[in-house]
Amino acid sequence: DSDKLKAFYLAVSNCKCVKVGFDSCCVPGIVTWMDVNPTLIESCESARFSAFISEDMKMYPCSFMANTNLWGDLRATSLLNIWQNSPAFKNHRAKILNSKCRGCKHYHICNGGCVFMPEINQCKNNYSDLW
């Protein structure tokens, strides 16, 4: 529920008594609802500069993708081969490159938000069909 998320971001931004850490998946909400210096924000790097490797040696573009079929098996092939040739990584990058957000003035901060879970994107543009 975006109203609850908005209320959360506003409450946290007004509270100076505690420190709250955010996952990079929260960047669209932070940019939209909080007064934060953009140079202090690090956006999602999934399939751009990072990957998640599970304890069973499956490599995913993002840790949120664990327990899906979007992985490469490091027991069967190399990290480089998965990174460059896996359908999961190729499809993830294609969605990033085709994002409607690329022309947005905030794109350099959030990189278009979350490809895998668009419901967590809290951008003011509110593209319901973002991906």
Regions found by a protein language model. Give the residues of each.
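Flexible mid-to-C-terminal extensions adjoining Fe-S/redox cofactors in radical SAM and related proteins
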Residues: K58-M59, F64-W131
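Radical SAM enzyme [4Fe-4S]-AdoMet core and its adjacent flexible, acidic
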Residues: D1-Y60, F64-L74
